[in-house]
Swiss-Prot record:
Oligomer. This is GCN5-related N-acetyltransferase 5, chloroplastic. It comes from the Eukaryota. The gene is GNAT5. One of its GO terms (biological process) is N-terminal protein amino acid acetylation. It comes from Arabidopsis thaliana. Gene3D superfamilies: 3.40.630.30. GO terms for molecular function: N-acetyltransferase activity. Protein acetyltransferase with dual specificity triggering both N-alpha-acetylation (NTA), with a large spectrum of modified N-termini, including methionine, alanine, serine and to a lower extent threonine and valine as substrates, and epsilon-lysine acetylation (KA). Residues 1-55 form a transit peptide. One of its GO terms (cellular component) is chloroplast. It is an enzyme of class 2 (transferase). Its EC number is 2.3.1.255, 2.3.1.48. Belongs to the acetyltransferase family. GNAT subfamily.
Amino acid sequence: MAALSISLAFSVDSLKPTQSTKFGFSSSSHRYPLLYSCKSHRSNLRFAFPPSSVSTATETGEENSKSTGNYAFLEESFRTGRFLSNDELEKLKTLEGFAYFQELESGSMWVRVMRHEEMDSTVHLLAESFGESMLLPSGYQSVLRFLIKQYLIERREVLPHAVTLVGFFRKKVDEFSDDGEEEAVMAGTVEVCLEKRGANASPPSPTPPKESPYICNMTVKEDLRRRGIGWHLLKASEELISQISPSKDVYLHCRMVDEAPFNMYKKAGYEVVKTDTVLVLLMLQRRKHLMRKKLLPLCTNPIVEMVGSDNELTSSANV
């Protein structure tokens, strides 16, 4: 059973029953239809409202063209509906074009930012894994899905300061098989807090610095574990942090009882900086390590390691 890193902004204890390679795309890919192409735009942009929110005060044609040009480059999933600074818009463009691709022994996978239409699938994936790690009965799944969806909606409002990534996997087809190409499926997800404005209001203990990037809520679909997917979710998160965040100290949590994830994080370069006291047991929580890694400067051709077990890649927070 894989542990799940979860740091939702509500207590789930009440639900218990009583007891690397960066792959940049400049055009559409028929092989990986779920990847979006990244377009280059140069503009002094200041807000990202959808068309219905743009002022209709257009006494001149020049005013109208100026307004529509300010949001047109962003896909609907990245339009926040609030005024943004130029720096925030540049980060949104980076998120929109971010893609991480890796060939695995059993197939191929890629990671990018979650789109709005993928929220329900992501909620279902998180609810399954979190319910599994908490040993919750199936009757609690609908409540858990509702709470997780509300959490994801709230987290999307802080884009581009925090982001949810999703990973897709396509199984390798035997060259001698007559079957067509396998359909890509959502295989995992992970949340990345990039800076203080994206930090969770109620982070698990030990508390990580709010100004530093933080990786959490990582999970891999149960029937796709032990393929290296979780490892590359972690590597994709680190690569995105290297591109956007000025801070290179990355934090995450790992439960003390999760020996395999702990060993994996150690291998990935994370070190324990603080550990929960026994007092957290009084709150019916597992003791956790807070771990930190200092990222190296982003290189143009990073060497990506292959790891065979996803069970070693999940971490846990307030469970």
